[in-house]
Amino acid sequence: MAGSMAQSKWLAYCRLMRINKPIGALLLLWPTFWALWMAGKGIPDMHILLVFTAGVFLMRAAGCAINDFADRKFDGYVERTKTRPLPSGAISEKESKILFVVLALISFGLVLTLNKMAIWLSAVGLALAWLYPFVKRFSHFPQFVLGAAYGWAIPMGFAAVSESLPLECWLLFLVNIFWSVIYDTQYAMVDRNDDLKIGVKSTAILFGRFDKLIIGLLQLAMLLLLVLVGYLINLGGIYYWSLLLTGTLFIYQQKLIAGRERELCFQAFLNNNYVGLVLFLGIFFSYV
């Protein structure tokens, strides 16, 4: 009996950290890799690469823990989230907060092996990770905070590798903010009806009937910024082919969200993993 209860608790913790749903970690991992490869001119330091890769999965898990704590009074009313560990009672509020602190401390321990500039920047990253889940209570722009939180590994990566924050670093950071608004708006379109009932704010609600148009404009802006980044650091032709393929993926996403059907909007969200991968491959092979 005790063993069964322990296993059940462990599985609940795994669900809280979304170990069974790696898409969020991957959407955080790709921009981190973009930055490390660009900052390292195609040859990232192995120690730095390992620290950031581990940090991505740890901080994503920490972000899920604090997000579910912030949403604990709302998730029970949303079809997609009502079986999560907190609303279902499998994990207590105290346990979720302890998990967040433990994961954040382990992540900070890894950061301490980097240079001082990266260490100082990590404090901003932690603040953004904590802030995001609560922004949706009073603002329609939580996706912008998510973009900043998910993209903060970009300036941290440049700082860790080169101890500098060049123009391409901040352009790439802006690219990631646009991308985060794109995919998290698609994600929020899945829950829009439930969110309207319970008062949760999102860009999907703010954009209303212009949601598809604004997503399309952000996709175009993202591609134009990526062209500028490639020009600034002299990336090769294969990088621009990856941008063309990314544009094709964006067109496919527009087709998926055309009817605003829940399942298809979620598929559009998931498709962004391929966007991140294609862009990384374009950067990677430009340095080969």
UniProtKB/Swiss-Prot annotation:
Transmembrane spans: 23-43, 46-66, 98-118, 119-139, 141-161, 163-183, 213-233, 238-258, 268-288
Name of the protein in question: 4-hydroxybenzoate octaprenyltransferase
Membrane topology: Multi-pass membrane protein
Chief location category: membrane
EC id: 2.5.1.39
Cofactor(s) demanded: Mg(2+)
Superkingdom per UniProt: Bacteria
InterPro entries, per database record: HB_polyprenyltransferase-like, Prenyltransferase, UbiA_prenyltransferase, UbiA_prenylTrfase_CS, UbiA_sf
Any GO BP annotation: ubiquinone biosynthetic process
Reaction catalysed by this enzyme: all-trans-octaprenyl diphosphate + 4-hydroxybenzoate = 4-hydroxy-3-(all-trans-octaprenyl)benzoate + diphosphate
Its job: Catalyzes the prenylation of para-hydroxybenzoate (PHB) with an all-trans polyprenyl group. Mediates the second step in the final reaction sequence of ubiquinone-8 (UQ-8) biosynthesis, which is the condensation of the polyisoprenoid side chain with PHB, generating the first membrane-bound Q intermediate 3-octaprenyl-4-hydroxybenzoate.
GO cellular component: plasma membrane
PROSITE patterns registered for this protein in UniProt: UBIA (PS00943)
Organism: Photorhabdus laumondii subsp. laumondii (strain DSM 15139 / CIP 105565 / TT01)
Keywords of the record: Cell inner membrane, Cell membrane, Magnesium, Membrane, Transferase, Transmembrane, Transmembrane helix, Ubiquinone biosynthesis
Annotated localization: Cell inner membrane
Family of the protein in this entry: Belongs to the UbiA prenyltransferase family.
Pfam families for the chain: UbiA
Molecular functions per Gene Ontology: 4-hydroxybenzoate polyprenyltransferase activity
Gene, per the UniProt record: ubiA
Pathway where this protein functions: Cofactor biosynthesis; ubiquinone biosynthesis
